[in-house]
Amino acid sequence: MKARGWRSKLPRVLIGGIGIVVAIAIVSEISSDRDVGGELIVDVPTPTIESRSWAVGQEPTGVIFDGERLWIAETGFGTVTSYGLEGQRLDTADVGGQPAVLASGAGFVWALDADDGSVTQLDSDANVVRKFQVGLEPAGLVFLGDHLWVSDPTRGSVSKISIQGALAQLLEIGVSPGAITKTPEQVLVVDGETLTVTGIDTEGKIVGSFEYPDQITMGDFEHVPGSPTAFLSTPNALWIAFGGIGQVMRLTPAGTFSGLTRVPTGPLALAWSGNELWVVSTDAATITRISGTGTIVETHDIGGHPTSIAHDGNHGWVTDDEKNVLIQFTPVELVP
């Protein structure tokens, strides 16, 4: 099936990535406890990536960069902790439950607990501002236009929530809206049941939608995408990851299918380095670097059980929920 374009034209300028990542050697430095600065216990060179690691809280499953510091959802502890760019632990909030998905904006950080349908709002010092319910089984959240946007595939909705935690609008979106991302002007949500991407502007108006292919023939193989695992917008493309078939689909900003890139199967996480898409595969313990045009630059075996990835402009950051570490990936030209 050929993907259809936008039914109503959406802005084509999408969120820009930051930083350019080109890595050439690896050194793994892991501290012996949650504090930074532990003794070097691993030094295994692996070509093409430079890395350092620090111990963090139990079962880190989500990481974001808010422009100044890193925030990690430590699901096993029921905490959210901020970290400096040298790996130092800064502040910790006990939010309870199982925080897993994070978003930031307007000086706040929000932690989504999909198990109990709640979001905890934190200030920049990790003080709990408020906690509120957002849906039945919320799956993703982003912050845009002074509002938090939360997708809920069970309820088939996207909620627009004010900074004060009040429900400003409830939009019914398709059947099962799940993975969510944003551009500077709109929120984009993908529905794996209807194979649809829907755009919502900051006023809460649905401004357009398109369908992505339900079957793609490449060579002798036919690919059926299945349920989206992750979704990310970059300056010239939309990327939808399908962990079940081990593929990342590239779409133009207007919604036209422009290719598939093979990656390992299983849970996947995405980040943009400035000119490459970084795909973390949990089951394969790899990072696959993909160019802006969809070709594989290189695949790196990083070991462990990586769960999420973020980028700060100079470094990539990956969490590992088995080793309970935060791993920093640094471009070689930036290493002293």
Which residues make up each language-model segment?
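Predominantly soluble domains enriched in secretory-pathway, periplasmic, or organellar proteins
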Residues: 5, 9, 13, 17, ...
